[in-house]
Regions:
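Generic structural signal for short, solvent-exposed loop/turn connectors between secondary structure elements
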Residues: 1, 131-132
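RNase H-like nuclease fold core
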Residues: 1-46, 50, 54-65
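RNase H catalytic domain
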Residues: 10-14, 53-131
């Protein structure tokens, strides 16, 4: 089974109050899992990576063998594809964690989309931020 993992993260202020959200869907659109979490004060990029790490962990837990990660973070997608280097020391640990999880899963692809194509994960992030 191939699944799509929609991830998002956001910070109000950069850094500022931050949260992430993810939605894991089966190929037919059935939601396998979704989650959002406030992570305190962080940058937008830390929030984006936190959502990716949490979503990959859930995919492993559910034994999903193949995942397409869908994100509106061009930086994160290009870093995970190896197109951009991770220059920020603050992101390096999260990048390494995401990379280890992706290798554990096996087949992971990354696709960058516009925010409008990532609405559900974005909504989860904003709900988590509004609740604080």
């Amino acid at each position: 089974m191939k699944a799509r993992l929609f991830t998002d993260g956001g910070a109000r202020g950069n850094p500022g109050p931050a949260a992430y959200g993810y939605v894991l869907e089966a190929e037919d659109g059935t939601v396998l899992a979704s989650h959002a979490e406030f992570i305190g004060t962080a940058t937008n990029n830390v929030a984006e990576y936190s959502g990716l790490v949490a979503g990959l962990r859930k995919a492993i837990e559910l034994r999903v063998p193949q995942v397409e990660v869908v994100s509106d973070s061009e930086l994160m997608v290009k870093q995970m594809r190896g197109e951009y280097r991770v220059k920020s020391a603050g992101l390096r640990a999260l990048f390494d964690q995401a990379d280890r999880l992706a290798r554990e899963l096996g087949k992971v692809e990354y696709r960058h989309v516009k925010r409008e194509q990532n609405e559900e994960a974005d909504r989860l992030v904003n709900e988590a931020l509004d609740a604080t």
